[in-house]
Amino acid sequence: MITFQIPSPFVECLEASRLLLERYNLKEAIIIPSHEESSSKEMRQAVALEGARYLQRTISDKDVIGVAWGRTMNHLIQVLNPCQKKDNTFVSMHGSIPHCQYNDVGSLVSRISMALGGQRFCFDTDALMRSKEELTRFLNMEENQKIAFLLKRISVSVSGVGSLYPELDSPLLNNNYLQQADIKALQAKGVYGDILLRFFDENGEECETDLKDRTLSIDFDTYRNIQTKIVVASGKQKAYTIRAVLRGELADVIILDYELAKQVIKISD
């Protein structure tokens, strides 16, 4: 008699995936083994590798792929297989962040389009405008209409997520993107995290501050209509943030390390 034994870490990951799929409205939950000796950068790279593999398995010719900024996204794009080119369109889902060269969405969209082939479209300006009126004027400019059109036709998106609860752990805070007054206003609204430069509360609903109306980014209603929203994250400190993402249906596919997944399950609804 032939028997097959799955190593224990993979059994735990499969069980965590099953529980998350059971409790939340997800298409897939991919959980990768965690190692106590692994650094946060190594775990970020590990989930990014799985994210790259999943993205390349998922996309088809003619897909419009939405791309976000971030450290995990930077690692994900580095490990894409350039032999698997398709006829896709890549579009930035938000504007740029000052002083953020390698992780910036413009750089990432250029690199992913070179790796996988296809056209690329980016907003060529900083994401945070001075006012709602300035943002409206920018979006109404003829040269930006194509990107605004494509945002409504994204079929697959991929992003990381920043954590702002229980600790302020988002890389956005390290890039002088927000003023101290902005951070206090977000905390007063119960901020839990950020995705696509938009800030959300414990239920995955956007925080109602003036940032909402002056941020150059896909709005949550349009984002939620994307058929396949892939969110890649690592680090158990993000558990409450990921729970908020799941409550708000801001992801269809999650790719997490086991320690993070275990914490999400522990606090899940």
Question: At which residue positions do the language-model features occur?
Answer:
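Gly/Ser/Thr-rich active-site loops/lids in small-molecule metabolic enzymes
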Residues: 170-201, 253
